[in-house]
């Protein structure tokens, strides 16, 4: 099994839910990314989503857009992000790392070269926001051949056909976007999430992580009651945007620890 699959199997065996925090590589300081990744793990992250900055992050709200702009202005590239993962792996061989980003940087590198470089760096999963599952069979096969889980998004508007298409190519877990719109949106409706997850699981035999709109321990716990994992990004990026540089890692670890405690108080995993 992959590191991601092992992680979710262990969580299920313990009756616990996953915590998947997101930060943008290179923001607020490229030299601090690896330190921040370790802070996430120390705070209780089960999987780390590391954003690859892109100039047109169409699915992201203003907080993550600004984060990408800052990282790009400081010279962050896909190559430097892979180097961050490699340096993280020097100390942490347990915590899975998922790269989340857009197709253009990967296509510039080439899927085969990317798969090899990501494997060698210690990447465990890849979520390419603008790769539709129906057109991703070759890409997903190349990732799986390199031991990397291809992860896909589903949304409240996803049809049964789209869910089935994801089921044909995804592995690791599925990222369910709980709201229409962009990351960081508010007005989380846990009952609608609970209603959608069985439809997903009937067609995709994978854990379901839920993100978009999770901003604190209370919303994280509410989502953990119905999902297999909680994904949180914009709130963490905002925390880093506002934190004093010398306090950023400690504040990040502390906030993630609060989320961890709240999630561990949630009910048993979704059926």
From Swiss-Prot:
<comment type="similarity">
    <text>Belongs to the TrpA family.</text>
</comment>
<comment type="function">
    <text>The alpha subunit is responsible for the aldol cleavage of indoleglycerol phosphate to indole and glyceraldehyde 3-phosphate.</text>
</comment>
<keyword id="KW-0057">Aromatic amino acid biosynthesis</keyword>
<dbReference type="InterPro" id="IPR011060">
    <property type="entry name" value="RibuloseP-bd_barrel"/>
</dbReference>
<keyword id="KW-0028">Amino-acid biosynthesis</keyword>
<feature type="active site" description="Proton acceptor">
    <location>
        <position position="60"/>
    </location>
</feature>
<keyword id="KW-0822">Tryptophan biosynthesis</keyword>
<keyword id="KW-0456">Lyase</keyword>
<protein>
    <recommendedName>
        <fullName>Tryptophan synthase alpha chain</fullName>
        <ecNumber>4.2.1.20</ecNumber>
    </recommendedName>
</protein>
<dbReference type="Pfam" id="PF00290">
    <property type="entry name" value="Trp_syntA"/>
</dbReference>
<dbReference type="InterPro" id="IPR018204">
    <property type="entry name" value="Trp_synthase_alpha_AS"/>
</dbReference>
<dbReference type="GO" id="GO:0004834">
    <property type="term" value="F:tryptophan synthase activity"/>
</dbReference>
<comment type="pathway">
    <text>Amino-acid biosynthesis; L-tryptophan biosynthesis; L-tryptophan from chorismate: step 5/5.</text>
</comment>
<dbReference type="GO" id="GO:0005829">
    <property type="term" value="C:cytosol"/>
</dbReference>
<feature type="active site" description="Proton acceptor">
    <location>
        <position position="49"/>
    </location>
</feature>
<comment type="subunit">
    <text>Tetramer of two alpha and two beta chains.</text>
</comment>
<dbReference type="InterPro" id="IPR013785">
    <property type="entry name" value="Aldolase_TIM"/>
</dbReference>
<dbReference type="InterPro" id="IPR002028">
    <property type="entry name" value="Trp_synthase_suA"/>
</dbReference>
């Amino acid at each position: 099994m992959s590191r991601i699959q092992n992680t979710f199997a262990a969580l299920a065996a313990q009756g616990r839910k996953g915590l998947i925090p997101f930060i943008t590589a290179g923001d607020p300081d490229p030299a601090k990314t690896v330190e921040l990744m370790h802070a996430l793990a120390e705070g209780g992250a089960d999987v780390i989503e590391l954003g690859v900055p892109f100039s047109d992050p169409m699915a992201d709200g203003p907080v993550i857009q600004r984060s990408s702009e800052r990282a790009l202005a400081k010279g962050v590239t896909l190559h430097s992000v892979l180097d961050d993962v490699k340096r993280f792996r020097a100390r942490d061989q347990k915590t899975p790392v998922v790269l989340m980003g857009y197709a253009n940087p990967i296509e510039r590198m080439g899927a085969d070269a990317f798969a090899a470089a990501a494997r060698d760096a210690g990447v465990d999963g890849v979520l390419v926001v603008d790769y539709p599952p129906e057109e991703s069979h070759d890409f997903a096969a190349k990732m799986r051949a390199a031991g990397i889980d291809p992860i896909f998004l589903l949304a409240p508007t996803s049809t049964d056909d789209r869910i089935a298409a994801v089921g044909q190519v995804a592995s690791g877990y599925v990222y369910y976007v709980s709201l229409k719109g962009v990351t960081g949106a508010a007005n989380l409706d846990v009952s609608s999430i609970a209603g959608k997850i069985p439809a997903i699981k009937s067609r995709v035999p994978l854990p379901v992580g839920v993100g978009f709109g999770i901003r604190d321990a209370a919303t994280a716990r509410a989502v953990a009651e119905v999902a297999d994992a909680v994904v949180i990004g914009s709130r963490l990026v905002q925390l880093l945007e506002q934190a004093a540089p010398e306090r950023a890692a400690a504040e990040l670890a502390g906030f993630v620890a609060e989320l961890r405690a709240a999630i561990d108080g949630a009910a048993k995993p979704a059926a």
